[in-house]
Swiss-Prot record:
GO cellular component: ribonucleoprotein complex; ribosome
Database matches in InterPro entries: Ribosomal_eL18/eL18-A/B/_CS, Ribosomal_eL18_arc, Ribosomal_uL15/eL18, Ribosomal_uL15/eL18_sf, Ribosomal_uL15_CS
Lineage top rank: taxon: Archaea
Coiled coil residues, start to end: none
Swiss-Prot/TrEMBL GO biological process terms: translation
Family: Belongs to the eukaryotic ribosomal protein eL18 family.
PROSITE patterns xref list: RIBOSOMAL_L18E (PS01106)
Name assigned to this protein: Large ribosomal subunit protein eL18
UniProt entry keywords in alphabetical sequence: Ribonucleoprotein, Ribosomal protein
Length: 118
Protein backbone atom coordinates (compact mmCIF):
# COMPACT_ATOMS: atom_id res chain seq x y z
CA UNK A 1 0.00 0.00 0.00
CA UNK A 2 1.49 3.31 -1.08
CA UNK A 3 1.40 6.47 0.98
CA UNK A 4 0.95 9.91 -0.44
CA UNK A 5 0.29 10.94 -3.99
CA UNK A 6 1.80 9.05 -6.88
CA UNK A 7 1.63 12.23 -8.97
CA UNK A 8 5.24 13.37 -9.22
CA UNK A 9 4.32 16.96 -10.10
CA UNK A 10 2.10 17.20 -7.01
CA UNK A 11 4.88 15.81 -4.81
CA UNK A 12 7.32 18.40 -6.17
CA UNK A 13 4.76 21.14 -5.58
CA UNK A 14 4.25 20.03 -1.97
CA UNK A 15 8.01 20.00 -1.39
CA UNK A 16 8.45 23.50 -2.81
CA UNK A 17 5.48 24.81 -0.80
CA UNK A 18 7.03 23.48 2.43
CA UNK A 19 10.28 25.30 1.66
CA UNK A 20 8.54 28.70 1.52
CA UNK A 21 8.82 30.97 4.54
CA UNK A 22 5.12 31.95 4.52
CA UNK A 23 2.81 30.05 6.85
CA UNK A 24 -0.01 29.97 4.30
CA UNK A 25 2.08 27.95 1.82
CA UNK A 26 2.99 25.41 4.51
CA UNK A 27 -0.71 25.10 5.37
CA UNK A 28 -1.58 24.56 1.68
CA UNK A 29 1.10 21.84 1.47
CA UNK A 30 -0.45 20.07 4.47
CA UNK A 31 -3.88 20.21 2.81
CA UNK A 32 -2.50 18.81 -0.45
CA UNK A 33 -0.85 15.91 1.39
CA UNK A 34 -4.27 14.71 2.58
CA UNK A 35 -6.02 11.99 0.57
CA UNK A 36 -7.67 13.10 -2.66
CA UNK A 37 -11.15 12.38 -1.30
CA UNK A 38 -10.54 15.05 1.37
CA UNK A 39 -9.25 17.68 -1.06
CA UNK A 40 -11.12 20.98 -1.29
CA UNK A 41 -13.60 21.64 -4.08
CA UNK A 42 -14.91 25.20 -3.91
CA UNK A 43 -17.64 26.77 -6.03
CA UNK A 44 -17.58 30.34 -7.32
CA UNK A 45 -20.56 31.38 -5.18
CA UNK A 46 -18.59 30.61 -1.98
CA UNK A 47 -15.68 32.72 -3.20
CA UNK A 48 -18.15 35.52 -3.94
CA UNK A 49 -19.76 35.24 -0.50
CA UNK A 50 -16.60 35.13 1.62
CA UNK A 51 -14.32 37.55 -0.25
CA UNK A 52 -14.11 41.23 -0.99
CA UNK A 53 -12.77 43.05 -4.05
CA UNK A 54 -9.05 42.53 -4.71
CA UNK A 55 -8.62 39.73 -2.14
CA UNK A 56 -6.32 36.80 -2.83
CA UNK A 57 -8.14 33.48 -2.43
CA UNK A 58 -6.06 30.31 -2.07
CA UNK A 59 -7.80 26.97 -2.69
CA UNK A 60 -5.80 23.77 -2.02
CA UNK A 61 -7.87 21.86 -4.57
CA UNK A 62 -10.20 22.61 -7.46
CA UNK A 63 -12.39 25.64 -8.15
CA UNK A 64 -15.76 24.78 -9.72
CA UNK A 65 -18.05 27.06 -11.73
CA UNK A 66 -21.36 27.04 -9.84
CA UNK A 67 -22.60 30.55 -9.08
CA UNK A 68 -21.52 34.04 -10.08
CA UNK A 69 -18.72 36.37 -9.07
CA UNK A 70 -19.51 40.09 -8.86
CA UNK A 71 -16.15 41.54 -7.82
CA UNK A 72 -12.53 41.04 -8.97
CA UNK A 73 -10.39 38.63 -6.95
CA UNK A 74 -7.17 36.73 -7.54
CA UNK A 75 -7.81 33.02 -7.19
CA UNK A 76 -4.90 30.64 -6.64
CA UNK A 77 -5.72 26.92 -6.87
CA UNK A 78 -4.40 23.51 -7.84
CA UNK A 79 -6.87 23.37 -10.76
CA UNK A 80 -9.91 25.12 -12.23
CA UNK A 81 -12.91 23.99 -14.21
CA UNK A 82 -13.37 25.78 -17.53
CA UNK A 83 -16.57 27.64 -16.45
CA UNK A 84 -14.88 28.76 -13.21
CA UNK A 85 -11.94 30.23 -15.09
CA UNK A 86 -14.26 32.08 -17.46
CA UNK A 87 -16.37 33.54 -14.63
CA UNK A 88 -13.34 34.73 -12.65
CA UNK A 89 -11.81 36.40 -15.70
CA UNK A 90 -15.17 37.92 -16.73
CA UNK A 91 -15.47 39.60 -13.31
CA UNK A 92 -12.06 41.25 -13.76
CA UNK A 93 -10.18 38.82 -11.53
CA UNK A 94 -7.04 36.78 -12.07
CA UNK A 95 -6.58 33.01 -12.21
CA UNK A 96 -3.28 31.59 -11.02
CA UNK A 97 -2.00 28.06 -10.45
CA UNK A 98 -0.19 27.16 -7.24
CA UNK A 99 3.01 26.57 -9.24
CA UNK A 100 2.95 30.12 -10.58
CA UNK A 101 1.79 31.69 -7.31
CA UNK A 102 4.75 30.56 -5.21
CA UNK A 103 7.05 32.24 -7.72
CA UNK A 104 5.09 35.47 -8.21
CA UNK A 105 3.25 36.14 -4.93
CA UNK A 106 6.03 36.71 -2.44
CA UNK A 107 4.77 39.86 -0.76
CA UNK A 108 1.29 39.87 0.78
CA UNK A 109 1.63 43.21 2.59
CA UNK A 110 -1.54 45.26 2.36
CA UNK A 111 -3.51 42.40 0.82
CA UNK A 112 -6.09 40.09 2.34
CA UNK A 113 -5.26 36.43 1.74
CA UNK A 114 -7.91 33.82 2.48
CA UNK A 115 -7.44 30.06 2.51
CA UNK A 116 -10.71 28.44 1.46
CA UNK A 117 -11.67 24.83 1.84
CA UNK A 118 -14.96 23.07 2.43
Amino acid sequence: MSRGSTNIMLRKLITSLKKQDKAIWVRVAEELEAPRRKRAYINIYKINRYSKANDIIVVPGKVLGVGNLDHPVTVVALSFSKPAKEKILRSGGKVMSLYKAIQELNDFKGKTVRLMKQ
